[in-house]
């Protein structure tokens, strides 16, 4: 598709800077939201990315009426050559995250003088309410640990099955 070179360069610059590109599948959208200041139509973004996809520069995903394009290593090299960028500049997806602060230094809650409440710590109370008892029964496993759960699954010990008609459909057979 013919498009102005300034639009193609704007699309390639944004893709190289971010490392990813998102576009809604709407060819009639007047401007792409991330390139609205440069007046680049959404159709130009979709077609430029289609061209890069056919060259193997991006990988495409589509979900919920949106295209997602991810820059590949070959694509970053191609865009670096196309935009005349030095090798020190890399897409944002290849930047290393900032150092992780240890959890002891960065707490989400402020410390108080009051001690934290003690939990049950594996002990069950002597008396459970009906709701708690139902939940407790559900959580307990009837199969001992280490047993084969798949062998235990199925119809159980019933070897004879019978079909009884319901809702007046067909003639019900008397039980045998």
UniProtKB/Swiss-Prot annotation:
Chain coiled-coil ranges: none
GO MF annotations, alphabetized: RNA binding; structural constituent of ribosome
Top-rank taxon: Eukaryota
InterPro entries in UniProt: Plectin_eS10_N (IPR005326), Ribosomal_eS10 (IPR037447), WH-like_DNA-bd_sf (IPR036388)
GO cellular component, one term: cytosolic small ribosomal subunit
Location of region: Disordered: 104-176
Comp. bias intervals (Basic and acidic residues): 108-139
Keywords recorded for this protein, A-Z: Ribonucleoprotein, Ribosomal protein
Gene3D superfamilies associated with the record: Winged helix-like DNA-binding domain superfamily/Winged helix DNA-binding domain (1.10.10.10)
Family in the record: Belongs to the eukaryotic ribosomal protein eS10 family.
Protein name (database record): Putative ribosomal protein eS10-like
